[in-house]
Amino acid sequence: MPLVPLKPFKVPRRAAASQVSQSAIIPAPVGGLNYRDPISAMDPRDALVLTNLIPGQQGVELRRGWAEFADAVEVSGAPQSVEAVFSYKAPSSANDKVFMAANGNIYDVTAGGTPTVAVTGTGSTADEWWTTQFSTAADTFLLAVSPGAGYWTYSTTSGWVNRTGTVTGMTTSVRTVMVWKRRVWFTFANSPNVYYMNAVDAITGTVTSFPMGSLLRNGGYVSAMVNWTTDAGISVDDYLVVIGTEGDVGVWQGTDPTSAATFELKGVWYVGPVPLRGRYFTTFGGDVMIVSQLGLVPMSRLFTGQFSADNQNVGPAAKIQTVFAPLVRSLRDQKFWNVFVVPSSDVLVISLPVDGDVYRQFAMNVTTGAWCSFEGMPIRSAAVIGGELYFGQANGTTCKGLSGDLDGLAIDNTGGSYVLGEVQCAFNAFGAPGQLKKFSLARPIFFGPAAPSAQLTINTQYAFNDTAGAPAFSDPGASVWGSGIWSQAVWLTNNSYEGWFGTAALGYYGSLRMKLRGLPGTSFLSAHVLSEMGGVM
């Protein structure tokens, strides 16, 4: 076969270049905050930082904002801190009320705007009020007590009435009030006893003391009481839970405290020292949740022996316990502990007292039990009214929380900023813990009403470096039908959004750190990471 000359300038055929970059997925941290497990062996669905992002079943979602609802209360031009927020639920919703306490007075802020003085000079020493509702054949009442002020009631018919002097045995040192088995019960400041109204279905009359010192095995005094409805494995009943300041919890069953045959102690358990001020417990899902130095203690597990001081890992706050418990210890004697459930956001919130100038809350998804933290909400006193969160500020304003798009929206609808969320996912070896990796790109995926703004980095070698600055976000707005221009109008509907970010990081383990701003309802679903694998050295 004759030789064939090569064609000039022909490029020899080359083999295809091998792929050097590998792609891996980082799931959304739907498991929530995890301060419990080793940083080197954490579930990739957990987070080391999760702020203002509520973990759900599919992703983590930006919380809603907060806005001023009622103007500040001022005395001689100086704002008066809102120390309590509470409500009255009337038989007719038209007569519902929202009240707040400041400067020794009670104000009506139902309509928002300028507060109206409802009671002047209550005598309260710190404006810390404890309230509950009680209906009798005569009327529906709000029962309210405060050290220094005594015992007050409110109803649509009679308004605010000071009952302290008309109830035999009542003093102005009364601290808390609750209703159990058709009786009104009280605790007094620094007292080991509890007090109950002699007559059932009565808001006045005579109160009788009942000693509880024998159950306070660790000392202290009775801090509060709460009604707990449960079947306890036998039949549904209402139990009286008595909580001591040093962590002793007694559970009583019966109907009439005047007779041992109809009122008995079922047992005494230990939950660890509890906060000394504020409402540090809540009822939720047929259970009572108590904040203490052992975490968030559910009465159902305490009662059945599943939770104890030696077995705290079964508690709902087990994954945040190592950070949460020291905060309970250090802030125990401070005002403004609040625990409440906000149904509209599906969260149970533990609001801590302000620490210096830092306001912080821990929030648990009530469906999944996963935790996150909230920042940027200056909650001082709080109450959930009609499913909505109301809270008071140190600057005298009353606000609505977890509502609206902006944080800090003024009462005249000016100012405010979009909620800033922050996340650092668990460190991940991406299947090769012994190989060095060069992380070059990351692509987060979001779902929401508008594309969020984000900044991110990849932290390596167990670092917690922040992102450079915070992202800016501008609401794209939405067009109104009939006025929008065809092919130019913006219609806000939920959609998925993604984009590549340069990372330039080198290490054996990688962790996505990201800040984002956007509209409430924006969820972070996952991220893809592009990296080049190296050797062991």
Language-model segments: residues:
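Beta-propeller blade signature
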Residues: V200, E246-D248, Q361-N365
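A short beta-strand motif characteristic of beta-propeller blades
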Residues: F69-G77, P115-T122, W160-V167, F210-L216, ...
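Beta-strand initiation motifs
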Residues: G113-V117, S158-N162, A202-T208, P257-K266, ...
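Solenoidal tandem-repeat scaffolds enriched in leucines and small polar residues
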Residues: V177-S223, W228-I234
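Surface-exposed extracellular loop regions of Gram-negative outer-membrane beta-barrel proteins
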Residues: D238, V242-V271
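Asp-box/WD-like beta-propeller blade repeats and closely related beta-sheet repeat scaffolds
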Residues: T156-W180
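Beta-sheet repeat architectures centered on beta-propellers
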Residues: P2-T114, T122-A138, V271-D287, Q293-M537
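Structural signature of WD-repeat beta-propellers
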Residues: A101-A102, S146-P147, F188-A189, G244-T245, ...
